[in-house]
Amino acid sequence: RGPDREGICPRGGYTPAMYDFAVVGVGPAGARFARRAAEAGYDVVAFEQGTVGTPLACSGHVSTDVWGYVPDDAKQRLLQNRVYGARFHVGGPDTAAHPFYKSEEISNVIDRVELDRTLASCADEAGADVREEHTVADVDERHDTVELTVSNTDGTETVRAKMVAGCDGPTSRVRRQSGLPEPDELLHGVLAFDPESDDGDFVDVHLTVPRFFAWRIPRGDAGVEYGLAAPPGTDVTERFERLTDAYG
C-alpha cells in the first residue's frame, strides 16, 4: 500500500505524497474511520499528536456494542467489569437512590487507554499509516486537495490528501481552520481513580451539577472511577472534591 502519486515540484522541491484521506486524531473515531477507509482500499494516513490513548480522554464505561469494533480476542484484555444498572441521586451518596436495572448486563467497564490502542492497531493492520507524536499545525484547503503541515521530532513536513477527517476532539484545529461552526457548548470534565477494587455491578449517577452529572463507576480489580462534567465557569474542582469526600 502507499500514496498514489509523488514527484518533483516545478521549483525543484519535493511534492508530498497524496493520500486519499488524512485523519487528524487517532482516538476511537479517528482510528475507526482510518480502519474502515483502509479496508475499503483507500490510502490513509492518521496523525496523533502524542501517544495513542494518553492522556486518558474519557470514561471507560461503554455500551456492549463496543465488542463489534475490536477483534474477538480483545475482550479478555479490555473488560474490567459488567454493569447491570444505575442508581440515580439528586444529591450526594447519602441521598436516596433511584435504581434502574435489568437482569442482563447493559453496559461494560473497559480499559479505555487499551481500547484506543487496540483500535489504532486495527487501523494499522488494515493498511492505514498511523503516526504517533505527529502534530498537525496547519490545515490548508485547496481546490482539489488539502495540505497539512505536520511537525514531529524530526522537523516539519507537508502532507497532501484528497480529504481530511477531523477527529481531533472538542477543540479541533481541523474544524477551526476549515471554518466549520463551533459546538454550542463545551463541558469541563475531571476524572480521578481510587485503586481499591470494587466488583459492584451498578454505577452511581449524581444529578448535582448544571446541565450534566457526576458519576462513580466500579471497575473491578482496576478500582473505582469518579468523574464530573459541567459547563465552563462552574466550580468543577470544588464540586468534584465534595463528591469524592462524600464517598470517603
Task: Identify the residue ranges that each predicted region occupies.
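Predominantly flavin-linked oxidoreductase catalytic cores and closely associated redox partners
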Residues: 26, 124-248
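Aromatic/hydrophobic pocket-lining residues that form π-stacking "cages" and hydrophobic walls in ligand
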Residues: 33, 119, 145-148
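Extreme N-terminal starter segment of soluble prokaryotic enzymes
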Residues: 17-21
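Conserved dinucleotide-binding and phosphotransfer motif residues
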Residues: 40-42, 122, 126
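Glycine-rich FAD pyrophosphate-binding loop
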Residues: 22-26, 32-57
